[in-house]
Amino acid sequence: MRVAVTGGTGFIGRYLLRELLGQGYEVNAWFRHEESRTGILEHPKLHWVKGCLEDAGSIPLLLENCDAVVHNALWRPGNTFRGTEGDLAKYTQINLGGSLSLMEIAAKRQVDRFVYVSTCAVHEKIMDDRPLDETHPLWPFSHYGAHKAAVEKFVHSFAFGHQFPVCAIRPSGVYGVSHRISASKYYDLIGAIARGEDVECKRGGKEVHAADVARGITYLIAAPRDAILGEAFNCYDRYVSEIEVARIARDLSGSRSNITGVEKSPKHEIDTTKLRRLGMNFGGEEQLRKTVKDLFEAVVNPSATRSIQ
């Protein structure tokens, strides 16, 4: 089976490439420029296709001989997902318009599976009288979340109206060792602990490891058609408080850092029953501890060579 991947050179995308190739899939992957592929090892089943959301002409090449598509790409002018959308008309034209072009061409080619990587930011205004599951209303605060919610509506129309086997996965906040190590979530906090500095921990968030997102996507590729048709799937592991990360790092390092702050907890937990029913499980505390250990080692030995693939 051959899978077309957009956004394969990014943070989640690199974990996805490794997971797909590790499971024996052939992969066609978009890349924007040569520098974006830095650190990704060559693989006989990995086929690069130059292209991007702005270049509709590259879509047929990406989809050539493919049985499935994972759409993970996002065009953004800033370094963060929210608040750096820039010109909203351009942002929407590229991301929404490009996503629809990709979906439409894939549907015309009768691709067997299309997985859209959405986000849990589609529901940021949360109601207290119901579970935070996939039936919860989509009320985003950001334009980023709004465009993801808009694409999800076309997931419904393509699936329910045209019987195209498309679905969406909604990762929460995502952590893990990034190919740009210093950009990894918790890197600065762990670095401060490694240096023996005192830290004050104030934040926490709903998190899932990038490797778990990648595995979740493969479950959606392999699931029966009727189980995914037009559906969205929450992808979330656990709430991670900064003070928990700091304490793990201190235990690993033997640091004398003084850690202050309180253990944060979520007001609403995200329900992941649907994805778990397909066989998915998450890395939990063990995955978190391994990631903190890997980041700590990167801080103390920054010259070590690492590759996501």
Model-predicted regions and their roles:
Residues 3-23:
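N-terminal Rossmann NAD(P)H-binding glycine-rich loop of SDR-like oxidoreductase domains
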Residues 71, 97-143:
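Conserved Rossmann-fold NAD(P)-dependent oxidoreductase catalytic core, especially the SDR/UDP-sugar
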Residues 156-205:
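NAD(P)-dependent short-chain dehydrogenase/reductase
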Residues 204, 214-219, 223-266, 306-307:
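Mid/C-terminal beta-alpha module of Rossmann-like enzyme folds, strongest
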Residues 50-94:
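NAD(P)H-binding glycine-rich loop region in Rossmannoid oxidoreductase-like domains
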Residues 285-309:
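Amphipathic terminal alpha-helices
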Residues 147:
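Active-site helix of classical SDR
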